[in-house]
């Protein structure tokens, strides 16, 4: 868990700027870059550090975890958008949850600028709190949602799992109300 070196961050930054340039000039869905565009932009730099980062992306670009290397087929402009992560494997679930949470935050900020509230409903909410990164992000957006016209709502049948998260205190403190229905004997 050492993270990226400064030179790796630099080659990624350079590649991201290059692949987003056409999209920013003409922001339509067809111009939205995907992971293979980033992969190619890294290889085009002809630097060992860029090649190393590109090799690390191979699994997600052309390997068995390439599910995110495609244009989206989700119409995010509908009033109701549902994301289902059930089919994501264990390795992609955390990444998928972070992408979805980021998409939802984008919708909240967009709706706020239009004076519209956004209702965010997360079923099986305890799953978001299992992983440290998604739990921290959940707590952060939960706090910000209310200020930005969002109505965050979490539902779970596993209250015990929910309460075991260190982030749950922040979430509960930033909730107007909490409703507990009949619990299984193990969750009482």
Regions found by a protein language model. Name each.
Residues 166-181:
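A short helix-turn-beta junction within AAA+ P-loop NTPase domains corresponding to the substrate/partner-engaging
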């Amino acid at each position: 868990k050492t993270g990226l070196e400064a030179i790796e961050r630099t080659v990624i930054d350079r590649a991201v700027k290059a692949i987003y340039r056409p999209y920013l000039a003409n922001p339509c869905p067809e111009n939205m870059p995907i992971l293979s565009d980033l992969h190619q932009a890294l290889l085009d730099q002809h630097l060992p550090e860029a090649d190393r980062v590109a090799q690390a992306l191979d699994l997600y670009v052309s390997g068995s975890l390439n599910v995110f290397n495609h244009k989206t087929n989700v119409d995010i402009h509908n009033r109701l958008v549902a994301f289902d992560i059930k089919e994501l494997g264990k390795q992609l679930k955390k990444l998928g949850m972070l992408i979805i949470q980021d998409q939802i935050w984008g919708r909240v900020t967009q709706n706020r600028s239009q004076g519209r509230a956004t209702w965010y409903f997360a079923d099986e909410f305890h799953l978001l709190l299992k992983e440290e990164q998604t739990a921290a992000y959940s707590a952060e957006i939960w706090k910000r949602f209310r200020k930005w016209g969002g109505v965050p709502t979490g539902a779970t049948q596993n209250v015990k799992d929910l309460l075991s998260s260190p982030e749950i205190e922040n979430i509960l403190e930033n909730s107007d109300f909490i409703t507990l229905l009949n619990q299984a004997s193990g969750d009482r």
